[in-house]
Design a protein with these regions (language model features):
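Extended alpha-helical, oligomerization-prone segments that build pores/tubes and scaffolds
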Residues: 1-462
Length: 462
């Protein structure tokens, strides 16, 4: 279904096209999703704060304000907040569920600086910082002169030398922050028994990582070098539908072994690891049919407190993790409207370029096949050539198309009137009636926004 939704959104051909006939694909799925998305994003980003923490008591007011400021700063400044919301909501509207991943990431920040004319004391002070490393050094030595201009000597009779250093240093610092990223639907795995992420016995993030990235994450280098390359993720139905030929973002064939990509599963499993009979949540990294090990060769099975994934669904189905999307509600309408539109255009083509009936032996065929403005067709009798009349069915098709538009607006809550694009709504209608119609159309969108807020968005900021 997700592949079908993507193909419908991108207006891909159905495979039933006939050469010489209309091959148009209408865009009901895209219209519904792109029509609902601006309202949803505006609801969450219309104010200065995307999230506001409410104090439970008078003593909590200061901490609640601080939490509000911090979380909004992290979401909007440390991360691309609006872009994350856009892709999160769009995944949900298009592919049933949208998923984001929030986790703490430590990155090594490397900077280079150059210093000139440093004395020995200044150099020693600079290198007292353990994060500093000299990568290039040029030292000049010259004797110190006394007042008479002669070289000065110390108590041991050795000439006093002064050193000037020109150096290039490299500073390494670990920078940590909260990272929020969108997870493509095909990369997110969850148990079929799950109703929510929190109660699922198995959740995993399936992704392609280079050997270099795995080594930098602290996994055993020898094991990483022996992992088999894989590209199964590139051939999932959703990935094939999303990317055209040659657009795949992953490339397993490279001459540099460190840049070869491995299919890695970051798994969160509920299991009894200590033999006490109580399941706990553990994090396991899995690739090439083996559990990844740390630098010392020990399997990295770590007990964790939470699963870092947060999901939203626009039309949830009770007691199920996967609900419905707007694409599910409109994909059949797009097929029907595409069929009707194609037939209407084919009929219009035949009406404008009608076929000709000619009595054999009564008409010069060469004249008939040479279609020129004002041309002459030589015939032996006046009725030897006649035009085959094709009935125009467009007038009957337009009411059907309007009916389908009405069905779509009822299913999705998205219509030209709700978006302010239908001027006929304002004709001979009172202001109260217009407001009532707009509120009715916005009801479904507001419900989706409320569901988003109470599910994934709320859990993200906890």
């Amino acid at each position: 279904q997700r592949k079908q939704a993507l193909e419908a959104y991108l207006r891909q051909p159905y495979g039933t096209e006939i050469e010489g006939k209309s091959q148009i694909v209408t865009g009901e799925v895209a219209e519904a999703i792109d029509g609902a998305l601006p309202s949803l994003v505006r609801i969450f980003t219309g104010s200065d704060n995307i999230v506001v923490f409410e104090p439970q008591g008078p003593r909590d007011e200061a901490s609640a304000k601080q939490a509000t400021d911090y979380c909004n700063w992290v979401f909007n400044r440390d991360n691309e907040g609006v872009a994350i919301l856009h892709d999160w909501f769009k995944d949900a509207l298009l592919q049933k569920n949208g998923v984001v991943k929030a986790y703490w990431s430590d990155e090594e920040n490397i900077t280079k600086e150059r210093y000139f004319n440093l004395s020995n004391d200044e150099l020693a002070m600079l290198m007292s910082d353990d994060s500093m490393e000299i990568v290039e050094q040029d030292t000049e030595e010259f004797p110190i002169l006394d007042q008479m201009g002669n070289p000065a000597f110390d108590q041991m009779g050795q000439p006093v030398i002064n050193s000037i250093h020109n150096i290039t240093v490299q500073q390494k610092k670990m920078v940590g922050k909260v990272t929020i990223e969108n997870v493509p639907p095909e990369e997110f795995l969850i148990s079929k028994k799950a109703r929510t992420i929190a109660d699922s016995p198995f959740v995993a993030h399936r992704q392609m990582l280079t050997r270099s990235t795995l080594t930098a994450m602290g996994f055993n280098k020898k094991q990483v070098e022996g992992l088999q390359m894989g590209d199964a993720l590139a051939y999932t139905p959703e990935r094939v539908a999303r990317y055209a030929a040659g657009e795949q973002p992953y490339q397993t064939q490279t001459d540099d072994p460190s840049m070869q990509e491995i299919e890695v599963f970051e798994c969160y499993i509920k299991t009894d690891i200590d033999g006490k009979g109580i399941a706990s949540l553990v994090q396991v990294f899995y690739a090439s049919n083996e559990i990844l090990e740390d630098a010392k060769g020990k399997e990295m099975v770590e007990e964790v407190d939470y699963v870092p994934f947060h999901s939203i669904c626009p039309i949830p189905i009770p007691h199920k993790f996967f609900g419905n999307s707007l694409a599910d509600r409109t994909v059949d309408l797009q097929l029907i409207k595409t069929t009707i539109t194609r037939q209407m255009l084919d009929n219009l083509y035949l009406t404008n370029n009608a076929r000709v009936v000619a009595i054999e032996g009564q008409v010069n065929i060469d004249d008939l096949l040479t279609s020129t403005a004002g041309g002459v067709i030589r015939a032996k009798s006046q009725g030897a050539v006649s035009q085959l009349v094709v009935q125009n069915v467009a007038q009957a098709a337009f009411p059907m198309l309007q009916y389908l538009d009405t069905i779509q607006s009822k299913r999705t809550g998205v219509s030209d009137a709700s978006q302010g694009l239908d001027p006929s709504v304002l004709q001979n209608v009172t202001a109260a009636a217009v407001a009532s119609m707009q509120q009715a159309g916005a009801g479904k969108i507001e419900l989706m926004a409320r569901i988003f807020a109470e599910t994934g968005v709320k859990s993200l900021f906890k």
